[in-house]
Amino acid sequence: MIVFSLLLPLVLAAQDPSLPLPSDSYPDQRTAELVRSARGARERNERLVTSYTATVSQRLGVGIRAASRDRMLYRQELAARIEWYRDKPSRIEVVGAREGIPIALRKDQIPESLDEQVRSLIVNPAEDYLRVGFDNSDSDDGFVYPLREGGESLYRFAAGDSTVISLPSGQRIRLIELHIIPRQSDWRLMSGSLWFDADSYGLVRAVFRPARPFEFRRDTDPSDREDVPGWVNPKGEVKYVTLEYGLYENRWWMLRFVAMDAVGSMGTWLGVPFRMERVYADYEVEGGTPPDTASTFRPAGTIGRNDVGARFRIHAELGKSLRA
């Protein structure tokens, strides 16, 4: 706690927007303008969504790979209908749910803790939705969003290529790519690309992976390792995460597809591959009015109030002090 108290003022100072940005944050003015516009778009667009309805389906599977043999360890399918509201409680109706554990059970069953799992399907359009694979709780798990204010302290940026896509309506939209480059080798920092609509700067696509794999002995608190033998050091590597958005009502970019491919490992003899896909469809979106700044109501899908970036820096500094 003493170390934490000494470092906290330094961490908060690093968040101060009045402090100068690192000189290598952007290679050119084009990149700086793209980052500025993408940040501003969140205030103009996604936060104005007042309600939406959509259907969602999710499939995930966990395998086990040992002694040159692959087996299915766990599989799950969920389907639901979402009625989301920004300013009042939302509703989600489960249409179907089943899970199978082939190595232990002969038949599929209704998933345990279904209530919590279904909640994770709800998307708040105003959130930085980069915590794929984690629940929508107040925990600090997940990736540090690059475009958060002060993100330049953890990331560098570079404008990439532009491309044109055609929608079923015949409308053509130009996309601009933004490369995300982590400053540190940490599993909570992402490396990849974001594509934005050149007109509205709404997020259209994201493809990324962590800066490095997660390592139990490197990335957990000492208290979590006390009762674990020293030779045990499981690792987890996310191969890729993909987010794709669709344009609805010719205005709102809403999440329509999520995919993640990962693998856990224990040495060279045991692998646990994981695959998840989630599809949102049948959107009906309403909006146009800003939220009440005095309201304390938290819409469904809100991912906690804590600043993940600040927590990341605190943990990083504590880790350095403990190693010293």
Task: Describe the function of each predicted region.
Residues 2-11:
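Bacterial N-terminal signal peptides
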Residues 228-232, 244:
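Beta-strand-rich interaction surfaces with strong enrichment in secreted/lumenal proteins
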Residues 206, 256-260:
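Beta-strand-dense domains in secreted/periplasmic systems and polymorphic toxin scaffolds
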Residues 247-257, 269:
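Transmembrane beta-barrel wall of Gram-negative outer-membrane proteins
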